[in-house]
Amino acid sequence: MDLSQRLDEMELAIHKPSFRKGTGRANEVNYWVFDYTPEKELEVRERIEYMKNKNDRGDDDFEFVVFDLYDIIIDFLKKKSFMEKCYDFEKKRGIERIVKAVSNSMKVNDDDSLIVRYIKEHTPENAVVFLTGIGKCYPILRSHKVLNNLHQAFVRCPVVMFFPGTYNEQELILFNEIKDDNYYRAFRLAK
């Protein structure tokens, strides 16, 4: 099945009332990963925007809420006036240290990270959450961490992570090259 067909299948699945129930298969939390080849990023972004615009017209009985994780990180850094400090820190200490500093300041590894808190605070009751920007966040934010932390604290509506790479319901491989830690709780959407 090509990407366009998978996107169509994903859109149909999300509109089914059974998709939006509180739990997924086998009583698991309703978390999904839509994986795709990284070269198709723009096509995926266009479809998400199309679905969000269509949903905003009020045709559905639920709301799409799209969170670009990269934008959340950048907004946080700007609000704290950390952007210039990050540039300087990276020049002096390198990318590994800036990744650690930003991760620590946002509590990325905590169950109640600033990203989890932001998503919880900005998601209405009857919604489907789309997580985007995973590739743009690397290496500051790792996909398995986002899913694990969100899974612990946020179960009131389905979550779909759009993942530029491969997910086989056991491991996440970002950009089809970088193996993330294993993650078993989400289901692959539109195989």
Predicted regions and their residues:
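Short acidic, S/G/P-rich loop/turn micro-motifs used as interaction or catalytic elements
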Residues: 38-43, 72-74, 105-110, 135-139, ...
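Glycine-rich P-loop/Walker A and Walker A-like loops and their local beta1-loop-alpha1 context
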Residues: 1-56
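Glycine-rich, aromatic-bearing surface loops/beta-hairpins
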Residues: 142-191
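Mid-core helix/loop region of P-loop NTP-binding domains shared across ATPases and GTPases
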Residues: 111-123
